[in-house]
């Protein structure tokens, strides 16, 4: 699926690692701002049954707010939830195999800091290609650091939407948008912020 980019909806929100009691209310408020284009459910420590229950609730909130709902790592779960697509890392199922499962849905690919990986993803018709981490982050262990110049380099090669990820916050997000990132993936800055409530981080 070709992913249409709405410049007003430049945020790609990723779920917190743990679903807390207030989460669904916070998510609803954030999506109602109209700044989020995609939402990814990324829950590493939950059972399949728990993911299905949580995913159904999230999908409903996303649908009401015109936000695409994606599932991390798991095309089969994405299909089961009738999600809008999935995100795949380099160690997950191949894009071609995932395409057989989810059909003409969104499939995004992690490319770390590699133009070579991006070229493969583009050739395989990924819906978007993701690069990072651009900045330090506590959300997950950083194995790959990306430099901002890769965004401009890849933009010259393709019209495939580009996602920037890793340590993005209020102080650095504009730099990424000005250097050809179409979407900014955020998680820790929203959900683990000790200074601001989730909604306040993106207002």
Kindly label every feature range from the protein language model.
Residues 7-25, 106-113, 163-164, 168:
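Active-site mouth loops of central-metabolism enzymes
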Residues 10-12, 36-40, 66-70, 84-87, ...:
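Structural preference for beta-strand elements that scaffold enzyme active sites
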Residues 13, 88-97, 130-143, 170-203:
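Glycine-rich phosphate-binding active-site loops on the catalytic face of alpha/beta enzymes
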Residues 27-42, 124:
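Catalytic domains of carbohydrate-active enzymes, especially glycoside hydrolases
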Residues 30, 69-84, 98, 113-126, ...:
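Catalytic cores of alpha/beta
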Residues 38-101:
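N-terminal active-site wall of soluble small-molecule enzyme domains
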Residues 52-71, 97-114, 143-170, 201-203:
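Alpha-helix-loop-beta-strand connector modules within alpha/beta enzyme cores
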Residues 80-90, 109-156, 193-198:
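Glycine/Thr-rich beta-alpha phosphate-binding loop at enzyme active sites
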């Amino acid at each position: 699926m070709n992913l249409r980019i709405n410049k007003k909806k430049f945020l790609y929100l990723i779920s917190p690692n743990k679903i807390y009691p207030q989460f669904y209310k916070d998510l609803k408020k954030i999506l109602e701002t109209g700044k989020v284009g995609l939402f990814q459910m990324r829950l590493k420590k939950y059972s399949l049954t728990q993911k299905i229950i949580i995913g159904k609730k999230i999908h409903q909130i996303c649908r009401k707010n015109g936000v695409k709902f994606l599932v991390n790592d798991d095309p089969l779960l994405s299909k089961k939830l009738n999600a809008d697509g999935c995100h795949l890392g380099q160690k997950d199922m191949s894009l071609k195999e995932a395409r057989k499962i989810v059909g003409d849905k969104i499939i995004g690919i992690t490319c770390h800091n590699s133009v070579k990986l991006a070229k493969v993803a583009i050739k395989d018709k990924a819906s978007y290609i993701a690069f990072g981490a651009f900045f330090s982050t506590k959300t997950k262990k950083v194995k790959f650091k990306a430099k901002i110049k890769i965004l401009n380099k890849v933009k010259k090669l393709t019209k495939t939407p580009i996602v920037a990820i890793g340590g993005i916050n209020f102080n650095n997000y504009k730099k990424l948008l000005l250097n050809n990132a179409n979407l900014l993936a955020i998680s820790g800055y929203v959900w683990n912020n000790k200074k601001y409530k989730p909604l306040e981080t993106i207002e």
